[in-house]
Each structure stands twice: as structure tokens, then as C-alpha cells.
């Protein structure tokens, strides 16, 4: 990776290094090492669970949607979405955050009084700004998960802080997440700014704009914590352990 692509015209041919034609990219990262996806997120999430005294098992979404794995009997679901969003690959679209089969499985789980923690940079915009979105997708996001979209591609300084809410489990004053490209951890450069929906409350705010919401929580027949900051993007293990502890305490509080 050398920088953002600026030439997308397939008719532009290579002339020289100054005019490279189609596929031309900026070179501002030519001398930098940029961290990619290490696919170690189940380990990072699982380690935080273990540090808080809990065991865990992991599986991919497809194992749930095709019936190979059942989530009904678990006290808590930690849904890892990272920077996943529906993407055109060749002629097909893949990586939708909440495909229909997953929506059904999660709703069945919540109907049994379950607890879901879901974190992903595009957790709201992948549905609400998707031209192929269906009414049922919007209902699932806003009515079941209890979250809406305030602004997509939100620019932050990488700090998030606790909001004033009735949920006393969430009291850690601030966290930091990685938002700048670097060699150690993948960066979340432009996450969603969220809004509460159907009874949820803000629990984390972006530090550079206290009106912008980074996470919401809902307590009713079931409980949800929805964050646009991927859990694994928090910069230190201490912060991840603390955030996971607060989520667990919220789920366990009657």
C-alpha cells in the first residue's frame, strides 16, 4: 500500500511514473509499513473475556447462518464486525454485516432474553446507506439492535469518552482507538457516528465531538451494546479488558 488510488478511469494508459494511468495512487506511504488484517480478532476478544473470568468459543457467521452452530444457549454473543461491509467482489456482493439468515438467528437469540455485544466501523451505514437495503433490514437495525446512523465516515481524533446514562456499569472516563495508519494495528479511519433508537441510550461519545455517539446500550427483555469502534481497535490491552468488564457487568445486572 503506497497511498489512496486517484485514477479510476480504465481507459487511461500508462505513460510514465508521473502519469501512471488507471490504478494510479498517491505515494505518501511509500516508505511506511502499514499493518493489515492479522485475523487475530477472536484471540483479542477472547483474551479480554478470559481476563474477566469467562471462557468462550468462536465460530464464523456462516456456521451460524447455515445451522452448523447454535447460539441459543450462550449467555452472551460477541459479534466481531471490524471494518466489514457489503463489498462488490467481481460480479457478486459479499461481507454484508447482517445477512438475512444472521438477522433471524440473532433475533431468535434475543427473543430468548439474550445479550449481544456487536462492534464494527460500519455497523449502521452498511444497512442505512446501502442502495440494496430492504425495509426488514432497517427494522432489524433500529427495532431489534436499537441503533441508528447519525453520520457515516465520521472523522475523530481517536478518543472516546463515557456518556451520562442511567447504565452505571459504563463509567470508565475515556478510551483511545487507533485511527491513523501505522505498522502495528489496523486503523479505523472513518467509523459511523451512531444515534440511539427505540429505547437505547448513548454510552460512549467521540471525544472531539461530544454530540457524536460511538456506542449505545439497550436494556429491556434483552440487552444490546452496539459500538462503531471495533473492540480490537482499542489501543491497549488494559482498555480492552476494562471495556469488556463493563459490558459483562451491564449484561449481568438485573
Short names for language-model regions:
Residues 57-60, 111, 117-120, 226-227:
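A structural signal for short, well-ordered beta-strand segments and their strand-loop junctions
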Amino acid at each position: 500500500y503506497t497511498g489512496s488510488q486517484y485514477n479510476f478511469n480504465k481507459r487511461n494508459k500508462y505513460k510514465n511514473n508521473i502519469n501512471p494511468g488507471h490504478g494510479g495512487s498517491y505515494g505518501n506511504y511509500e516508505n511506511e509499513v502499514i499493518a493489515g488484517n492479522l485475523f487475530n480478532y477472536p484471540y483479542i476478544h477472547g483474551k479480554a473475556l478470559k481476563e474477566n473470568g469467562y471462557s468462550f468459543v468462536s465460530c464464523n457467521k456462516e456456521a451460524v447462518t447455515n445451522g452448523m452452530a447454535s447460539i441459543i444457549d450462550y449467555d452472551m454473543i460477541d459479534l466481531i464486525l471490524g471494518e466489514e461491509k457489503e463489498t462488490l467482489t467481481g460480479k457478486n456482493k459479499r461481507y454484508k454485516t447482517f445477512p438475512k439468515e444472521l438477522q433471524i438467528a440473532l433475533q431468535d437469540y434475543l427473543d430468548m432474553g439474550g445479550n449481544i455485544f456487536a462492534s464494527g466501523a460500519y455497523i449502521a451505514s452498511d444497512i442505512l446507506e446501502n442502495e440494496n437495503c430492504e425495509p426488514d433490514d432497517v427494522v432489524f437495525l433500529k427495532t431489534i439492535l436499537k441503533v441508528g446512523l447519525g453520520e457515516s465516515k465520521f472523522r475523530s481524533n481517536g478518543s472516546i469518552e463515557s456518556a451520562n446514562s442511567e447504565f452505571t456499569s459504563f463509567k470508565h472516563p475515556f478510551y483511545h482507538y487507533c485511527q491513523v495508519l501505522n505498522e502495528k494495528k489496523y486503523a479505523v479511519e472513518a467509523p459511523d457516528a451512531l444515534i440511539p433508537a427505540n429505547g437505547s441510550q448513548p454510552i460512549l461519545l467521540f471525544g472531539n465531538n461530544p454530540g457524536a455517539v460511538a456506542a449505545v446500550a439497550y436494556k429491556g427483555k434483552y440487552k444490546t451494546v452496539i459500538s462503531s469502534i471495533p473492540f480490537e481497535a482499542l489501543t491497549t490491552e488494559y482498555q480492552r479488558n476494562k471495556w469488556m468488564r463493563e459490558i459483562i457487568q451491564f449484561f449481568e445486572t438485573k
